[in-house]
Every structure is written in structure tokens, then in C-alpha cells.
From Swiss-Prot:
GO terms for biological process: autophagosome assembly; autophagy of mitochondrion; cellular response to starvation; glycophagy; nucleophagy; pexophagy; protein localization to phagophore assembly site. Component of the autophagy machinery that controls the major intracellular degradation process by which cytoplasmic materials are packaged into autophagosomes and delivered to lysosomes for degradation. Binds phosphatidylinositol 3-phosphate (PtdIns3P), and other phosphoinositides including PtdIns(3,5)P2, forming on membranes of the endoplasmic reticulum upon activation of the upstream ULK1 and PI3 kinases and is recruited at phagophore assembly sites where it regulates the elongation of nascent phagophores downstream of WIPI2. The L/FRRG motif is required for recruitment to PtdIns3P. GO terms for molecular function: phosphatidylinositol-3,5-bisphosphate binding; phosphatidylinositol-3-phosphate binding; protein-macromolecule adaptor activity; TSC1-TSC2 complex binding. Changing Y65A: Strongly decreased interaction with ATG2A. It is linked to Neurodevelopmental disorder with spastic quadriplegia and brain abnormalities with or without seizures: An autosomal recessive disorder characterized by profound developmental delay, progressive spastic quadriplegia and contractures, early-onset refractory epilepsy in most patients, and brain malformations. Neuroimaging shows ventriculomegaly, reduced cerebral white matter volume, and thinning of cerebral gray matter. It is found in: Preautophagosomal structure; Lysosome. Changing S204A: Abolished binding to phosphoinositides. This is WD repeat domain phosphoinositide-interacting protein 3. InterPro entries: PROPPIN, WD40/YVTN_repeat-like_dom_sf, WD40_repeat_dom_sf, WD40_rpt. Changing V35Q: Strongly decreased interaction with ATG2A. Changing R225A: Abolished binding to phosphoinositides. One of its GO terms (cellular component) is phagophore assembly site. The gene is WDR45B.
Length: 344
């Protein structure tokens, strides 16, 4: 989540994002970057620069390599460069320069994927990165792109050249035609893959519907309704076995849906009435909670199967627990920016 345009809190937080399995999250700051264990919350790394903001931090699971892009009032690095930071050596070891601003970076053990505003470039993850592929996208200012971290699945998903379409490419066999999914009529605002790379969830800028597709066929599996009013979707994430998804938006609410068992989701008692509009047959979240501050947040499932974590732009950390009935309670609250690495 790039917080640059929407973080009014003055706490120096520019970016927050989870690693591939959501076990850690990283923060880009006006004076460096930080890495935290997600659940339980613990500061793992704090790298401060005397002068220099980091607008994007991408982790590779828990290994010592991170991708950094400069940002903020005084960027540490030019915003058109990707810097690979070796946290053991405490220095950058790879640098890739582009002619335009970098919107996002994705990593897997063998690839560096760089998102520009209308194209995606794929490089080898080597000391001297070699460009392998270039894919055109529609205008993509949010840097939407997801890369499957599974060693047996090299799937890359990104906005297609047509509005609302998602393109799926297998980086291990790019000679195969990509899967093109006409996911929404409007502009995409969020996409997410499950860990296995078999499901993709999408939302448009309208933000009322979440759709889940099979990645091999492109077929729609489920359509879920977040709400009736438009919303800016900040984050969608699957749990470990892809049976649940959580969704955060600018309404200050985190919704939890059943992705595999639609009967768990709520539905109107009028759902079976064929003469009523499609809205009445919608599947709604079976559980939701309000982030008390209403601050922009990203969300993911915790170490317990019934736990959801919210990381907020105001520096708040929330852990909520939900039961099979959908009831939610707040279990943990903390201010993660005020922690030090010797505190829990």
C-alpha cells in the first residue's frame, strides 16, 4: 500500500506491505525502512538513513534481500531505480535503472519483476540482472501486479491492455498464450493470488464486488459483495489454504469472506426470488470488523486460522479474532512505529 497520497498522519510512513506468506510486513519511511514480524508483532529490522525516504519495500520471504525504491520528500534513491538491498552487508548490491518512475517491484527467488506505469519488465535475479520479458499493460499508476511465490508455479498476473482485464502469464513457459480474464467493466483497483497460484481475486475502482477466478481456465468461481456503496479497495489477501479472503477499504472496514464454501457467506432471504435484481442474490461477508481509527490499512490472516491482522497508515496494529458465527473481537492493539526491537 503506497501511502504517499493518502497518509495525513505525519508519522513518516510512506509504504506498508506484507511479504509473500504474510509472516512479515515491511514499511518504507521518510528516513529508511523497517521490517516486522506480523503475528506476534515484533520489530525485526530498522534501517535508518540520515537523509532519504523509501517509497517501496519488497521482501523475499524472510531472506536478506529486499527491493527498495526511493520516495517521500527527499528520496534516498532516484524513483526510477530499483535497488536490491543485502541486509547482511547493509548495502545495496544490485541497481536497475529505468527511463520512467518505478511503480512497484515483485520478487521471487529467480526473478525481479518491475512495474512501470504502462509496462512490466522481468529480469533474472542475478548480480547482473538480464532482462527476459516485457509485457504491455493499460495505464497502471497503482503498480498492480502479483507474482506467485510457489517454486512450482511461475504465474505473473497484471492488468491487461483492455480496461478491467487481468492477464496471467506463466514465466516458465511464455510461449504459451496468456490467460486473459475480463474481470470488471471498470478500472482494476486490486488483484491478489493465493499462495499456490490457483486462484486470483480482483476488485475494480467501484469496489463493491470482489471476484475470484480459476487461474488455469480464467473461469469465474465466486462473486462476493463487499457493500452497496463505492469504496477504494486497499488490499485483498487469501489465507494459507485459500478457503478465506480478507478485504480492506477506505470505509474503515475489513471484510472476511469464505472463498471455497459459499454457504458460509451471508445472503438475503430474498436471494431465490428470480424476479428481483441480481443485488438480492449477492453473497456478503460472513464476518467483518471496523478499524477503530478508520485509517487506510492492509490486512492478512494471522498465525491462527481465525485471526486477521490490520496494519494501518496511522501506525496502528490490530489483531482481530473471529468465530464460525462471524462474531469478531479485538485481541491485540499496538503502535508498531513506536516499538523497538527489544519490545514484544
Amino acid at each position: 500500500m503506497n501511502l504517499l497520497p493518502c497518509n495525513p498522519h505525519g508519522n513518516g510512513l510512506l509504504y506498508a506491505g506484507f511479504n509473500q506468506d504474510h509472516g512479515c510486513f515491511a514499511c518504507g519511511m521518510e528516513n529508511g525502512f523497517r521490517v516486522y514480524n506480523t503475528d506476534p508483532l515484533k520489530e525485526k529490522e530498522k534501517q535508518e538513513f540520515l537523509e532519504g525516504g523509501v517509497g517501496h519495500v519488497e521482501m523475499l520471504f524472510r531472506c536478506n534481500y529486499l527491493a527498495l525504491v526511493g520516495g517521500g520528500k527527499k528520496p534516498k534513491y532516484p524513483p526510477n531505480k530499483v535497488m536490491i538491498w543485502d541486509d547482511l552487508k547493509k548495502k545495496t548490491v544490485i541497481e536497475i535503472e529505468f527511463s520512467t518512475e518505478v511503480k512497484a517491484v515483485k520478487l521471487r527467488r529467480d526473478r525481479i519483476v518491475v512495474v512501470l506505469d504502462s509496462m512490466i519488465k522481468v529480469f533474472t535475479f542475478t548480480h547482473n540482472p538480464h532482462q527476459l520479458h516485457v509485457f504491455e499493460t493499460c495505464y497502471n499508476p497503482k503498480g498492480l501486479c502479483v507474482l506467485c511465490p510457489n517454486s512450482n508455479n511461475s504465474l505473473l498476473a497484471f492488468p491487461g491492455t483492455h480496461t478491467g482485464h487481468v492477464q496471467l502469464v506463466d514465466l516458465a513457459s511464455t510461449e504459451k498464450p496468456p490467460v486473459d480474464i475480463p474481470a470488471h467493466e471498470g478500472v482494476l483497483s486490486c488483484i491478489a493470488l493465493n499462495l499456490q497460484g490457483t486462484r486470483i481475486a480482483t476488485a475494480s475502482e467501484k469496489g463493491t464486488l470482489i471476484r475470484i477466478f480459476d487461474t488455469s481456465s480464467g473461469h469465474l468461481i465466486q462473486e462476493l459483495r463487499r457493500g452497496s456503496q463505492a469504496a477504494n479497495i486497499y488490499c485483498i489477501n487469501f489465507n494459507q489454504d485459500a478457503s478465506l479472503i480478507c478485504v480492506s477499504s477506505d470505509h474503515g472496514t475489513v471484510h472476511i469472506f469464505a472463498a471455497e464454501d459459499p454457504k458460509r457467506n451471508k445472503q438475503s432471504s430474498l436471494a431465490s426470488a428470480s424476479f428481483l435484481p441480481k443485488y438480492f442474490s449477492s453473497k456478503w461477508s460472513f464476518s467483518k470488523f471496523q478499524v477503530p481509527s478508520g485509517s487506510p490499512c492492509i490486512c492478512a490472516f494471522g498465525t491462527e486460522p481465525n485471526a486477521v491482522i490490520a496494519i494501518c497508515a496511522d501506525g496502528s496494529y490490530y489483531k482481530f479474532l473471529f468465530n464460525p458465527k462471524g462474531e469478531c473481537i479485538r485481541d491485540v492493539y499496538a503502535q508498531f512505529l513506536e516499538m523497538t526491537d527489544d519490545k514484544l
